[in-house]
Structures are given as structure tokens and as C-alpha cells.
């Protein structure tokens, strides 16, 4: 959605990395796309349907268009230093399905915790799959590394919310990364929309679908689902 003013600089850094192959940029608002030659770079594939296809369909699109054994799903307002890509490139993923970002210690669930002077620490999670992952102080939807073989196509019933939960509930070996080299804010794009916007209406529909269908363990009792299950859209 091009809300991050430094995005083109981020892309330049990623293109310079020997550990980054193809970069698939899903343009959900072509009218706001900045003018930059970086989009002509050989590593970048710019995809635009002329409208906002929303978060989870964009993830699925990236999966379809990629050919790497290891995928990075990354929000435009998150910056990942090259050392992280190097770390992931050298990591044995044999017993790893999915890696997300650590939030523990944050004052809220909207900021990635900075761990200064800390080496990268990979922690295996005993995830409570009966609760949404965001409420457990881990961020997967903003930055995650997942094996191609572990990715599952997210149903079109869920277009903004619950994509990370869908993947997590279908993965066995789930980890989180403590690091000072992934920075940014969470949900910055979502909170920019007013309550009557199509985005907010879509969030309500996602929640209603999570209540109605059986894609998630215990989702009928999730606070987010309860909040919107009877709301008009």
C-alpha cells in the first residue's frame, strides 16, 4: 500500500544481497506507487491487478510466482538487515517449517522488540493453536520465513486476517527469532483505514467466516472473532 516512505531504499538493499533471489512486489495501490528505477531491477517482479487484492491473496500470489525452497513473506513497513538473510540461507530447515518474529517484552503488540547486542536466537515455540498467534506476542504476518513445502494456500474466505494462523495451524515445527536486525511497526497500514472503509468491512467478513467455518481450532471463542461476529458490514 506504499505507506512506508523508505520502501524503495529497502528494496535497493534487498536487491544488493547475495542471499536474496527473486523479489515479488505485490502492488495493492498503483496510484500511490513511488517513481523509482528500482522496479526495473532484474530481481524484482512487480505485480499489479489495478486494485487492492488484500494480504492473504498477495501471499498466495507470491507463493505461486516463486520457485525458491525458502520463502520470506515480508510487509513493506518492515526492514530486514542482510545479516538475517545470510542467517536464514545458512540455517538447516530440515526440522523447521516456519519462523516468525519475537515480540516478547514489547509495550504492545504493534512493535517488534529490539534486542540490542544480542546474537540471533532461534526459539522453538510450543504454540497454543487454540488462540491466535498475534495475541501470544509473536509476529508472523509481518515477517516470516517458511519452507515452500510447508506453505498452504490460504482460503479466499480470509483475505486480510488469519493468514498467519492458517499457516501456523498446519505447521509442526514453528520457531521465533530474537534479533536486533528486524525493525518496524505492525498493523501500520491497517490502522490507517477508517471504520467504514472496504478494508474494515473485509476484516469483519474475515472474522465472520472464522466463526462460521472450521479452519481454526477454537476460533469461535477468539476475542477478535467474538468482537465482529454479529457486526454488520
Q: What do these predicted ranges mean?
A:
Residues 2-16:
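Short, well-formed alpha-helical segments that are part of the catalytic scaffolds
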Residues 26-35, 79:
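A conserved acidic beta->alpha catalytic loop
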Residues 49-66:
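Glycine-rich, basic loop-to-helix element that forms the pyrophosphate-binding segment
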Residues 68-79:
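Short beta-strand-to-loop acidic/aromatic patch adjacent to the donor-nucleotide binding site
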Residues 85-98:
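Conserved donor-nucleotide/metal-binding helix-loop-beta segment in metal-dependent transferases, i.e.
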Residues 99-116:
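Short beta-strand-to-loop element that shapes/binds the nucleotide-sugar donor at the catalytic cleft/hinge
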Residues 124-146:
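A recurrent flexible, glycine/aromatic-enriched loop bordering the glycosyltransferase active site
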Residues 157-233:
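C-terminal catalytic/acceptor-binding lobe
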Amino acid at each position: 500500500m506504499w505507506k512506508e516512505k523508505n520502501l524503495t531504499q529497502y528494496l535497493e538493499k534487498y536487491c544488493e544481497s547475495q542471499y536474496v533471489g527473486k523479489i515479488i512486489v505485490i502492488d495493492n495501490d498503483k496510484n500511490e506507487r513511488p517513481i523509482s528505477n528500482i522496479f526495473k531491477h532484474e530481481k524484482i517482479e512487480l505485480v499489479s491487478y489495478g486494485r487492492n487484492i488484500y494480504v492473504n491473496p498477495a501471499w498466495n500470489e507470491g507463493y505461486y510466482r516463486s520457485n525458491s525452497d525458502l520463502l520470506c513473506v515480508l510487509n513493506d513497513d518492515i526492514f530486514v538487515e542482510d545479516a538475517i538473510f545470510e542467517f536464514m540461507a545458512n540455517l538447516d530447515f530440515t526440522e523447521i517449517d516456519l519462523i516468525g518474529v519475537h515480540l516478547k517484552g514489547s509495550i504492545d503488540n504493534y512493535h517488534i522488540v529490539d534486542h540490542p547486542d544480542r546474537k540471533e536466537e532461534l526459539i522453538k515455540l510450543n504454540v497454543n493453536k487454540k488462540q491466535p498467534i498475534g495475541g501470544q506476542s509473536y509476529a508472523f504476518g509481518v515477517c516470516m520465513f517458511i519452507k515452500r513445502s510447508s506453505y498452504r494456500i490460504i482460503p479466499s474466505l480470509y483475505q486480510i486476517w488469519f493468514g498467519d494462523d492458517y499457516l501456523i495451524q498446519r505447521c509442526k515445527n514453528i520457531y521465533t527469532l530474537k534479533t536486533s536486525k528486524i525493525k518496524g511497526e505492525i498493523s501500520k497500514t491497517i490502522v490507517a483505514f477508517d471504520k467504514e472503509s472496504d478494508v474494515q468491512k473485509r476484516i469483519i467478513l474475515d472474522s465472520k467466516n472464522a466463526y462460521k467455518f472450521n479452519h481454526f481450532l477454537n476460533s469461535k471463542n477468539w476475542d477478535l472473532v467474538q468482537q465482529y461476529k454479529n457486526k454488520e458490514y
